[in-house]
Amino acid sequence: MGKIIGIDLGTTNSCVSVMENGKAKVIENAEGARTTPSIIAYANDGEILVGQSAKRQAVTNPHNTLYAVKRLIGRKFDEEVVQKDIKMVPYKIAKADNGDAWVEVNGNKMSAPQISAEVLKKMKKTAEDYLGETVTEAVITVPAYFNDSQRQATKDAGRIAGLDVKRIINEPTAAALAYGMDKAKGDHTVIVYDLGGGTFDVSVIEIAEVDGEHQFEVLATNGDTFLGGEDFDIRLIDYLVDEFKKESGMNLKGDPLAMQRLKEAAEKAKIELSSSMSTDVNLPYITADATGPKHLNVKISRAKLEALVEDLVQRTIEPCRIALKDAGIDVGSINDVILVGGQTRMPLVQQKVTEFFGKEARKDVNPDEAVAMGAAIQGAVLAGDVKDVLLLDVSPLTLGIETMGGVMTALIEKNTTIPTKKSQVFSTADDNQGAVTIHVLQGERKQAAQNKSLGKFDLAEIPPAPRGVPQIEVTFDIDANGILHVGAKDKATGKEQKITIKANSGLSDEEIQQMIRDAEANADADAKFAELAGARNQGDALVHSTRKMVADAGDKVTAEEKAAIEAAVVALEAAVKGDDKAAIEAKIEELSKVSAPVAQKMYAEQGQPADGAAQQAEPEAKHDDVVDAEFEEVKDQK
């Protein structure tokens, strides 16, 4: 069996590693570099250039040179973040027939996984040249906060590149693996702060030693999938454009060639300012007008760069705070802070991290290489070559289904260790309901409509039965790649439906962050909504059971009793449509009171103790683990 390689498929740069003699080794590419720019170019003669060669010709071929494509992977064209990206890049981002964000080169539309596959092919070839054998299997890393569709799309890219992706693992977790292999004995908790080219992640990871085996358990993860070094570059580019405009009156934003030169210069200046206090951006012949050629020469200090990007660095701190809270630990419990991603070389980033965590970050882990090395270690674990490492990763967001009253019922809570499988039994909302629709949701809010819809599917041919009687078992199964599979089974007939949540639009970074912020800010509102939904469900159940009881009682109910009960039922139905929980509860009590004598007659006749409304409020609740679910009836298409 061949080696399983580890690939860090980055927004800006990619890296490949393999296990040799018990250690992860980063493999140099054909140009002799340990990392490869994640840049793909389509030359006029049809040649596809990848890496450094693509980067070198970007200035003369801006429209056909693709970079930061990872920011589009698994996303819809109409998403706000994609629309923002369109304004920033010189190449064309187009809308695919399925609504995804694709790129267009020379009139040909291509998907983000297709483009990413070119980088993966280069990584595969780099490993094959070094190992002298064909490579078919890989572990590929993704940002911890990548959603289901982004993970699926990354796996697709691997398949397009001719790789069997054995596992998708989170970048911070991979970095912790690379770091933890050489650690001293004993248990310790680490923070992995990963600020790369296009994404930011933070993970709280516990490394425990159990019977000589290193166990890596992710306690919590958080992040922003649209914040990274590219955003820092954009701030610097905008500043340079403004300075040139002040001096010459010309706007470079309409000139793709000039903007490509500026992008290169800004990235170079940003890197230089990590070790120097100031630098010059000098671009002769940047453009020309009727008076002749124009030159750009701007001096930038480290302080100026820090002022331009300070809010971006500050944006990384709140996810750190949330991750610690979710992990249930305080800053004092952290043993080490690991910095991953090239952008963490910036002194301001290091300073803010040190201030927040109260300790200096470790400098002995190469921020550009740690992720690929961790992926190679995980590859060796899967191949059975490394036996003393166990990796326990987590699902970053809560997953559940929509149930009665528009509530999201969670099956898998956020930060649950994966792989995992959870089942819960639900039932029908109407008598003789022949089909149910399972609506799968992802997010942190109590109201179903406030969360992201991942998909719907139907379970049909349910035998006719009163509401609450059928038992529909819904199962959520997250595999080791963090990809979700959902099934629904009618326990009476054994009929089953399953879906894998396919690579649809998934969640945008703004939605994910907003969900968690909203969930915290609106905790009280969510609790009130949950109570109101509970009261509505109780009212609906009482209306249904009371009407059934009156029908069953027949002539044992007097006309006066029937009229009083009907009036109370109508009043409760009206209250249930409103938003006043107290009013619903008052009408429930009223209906319970007027229907109690009839209930007593019925139970007395059957020789059972009468307990009025308490007995008849939910006569069909035969199963404690059955939850009323709001399922839609599906009509057969004739």
Swiss-Prot record:
Top-level taxonomic group: Bacteria
Family annotation (InterPro entries): ATPase_NBD, Chaperone_DnaK, Heat_shock_70_CS, HSP70_C_sf, HSP70_peptide-bd_sf, Hsp_70_fam
UniProt GO MF annotations: ATP binding; ATP-dependent protein folding chaperone; unfolded protein binding
PROSITE patterns cross-referenced by the UniProt entry: HSP70_1, HSP70_2, HSP70_3
Biased composition (Low complexity): 604-618
Region (Disordered): 602-638
Basic and acidic residues composition-biased segments: 619-638
UniProt keyword list: ATP-binding, Chaperone, Nucleotide-binding, Phosphoprotein, Stress response
Keyword Chaperone: yes
Pfam family, one: HSP70
Residue list for modification Phosphothreonine: 199
Record-linked Gene3D superfamilies: 1.20.1270.10, 3.30.420.40, Actin, Chain A, domain 4 (3.90.640.10), Substrate Binding Domain Of DNAk, Chain A, domain 1 (2.60.34.10)
Induction: By stress conditions e.g. heat shock.
Record function comment: Acts as a chaperone.
Family label: Belongs to the heat shock protein 70 family.
NCBIfam families: PRK00290.1, PRK05183.1, prok_dnaK
Protein name stated in the entry: Chaperone protein DnaK
Naturally occurring in which organism (per UniProt): Pseudomonas fluorescens (strain SBW25)
This protein's encoding gene: dnaK
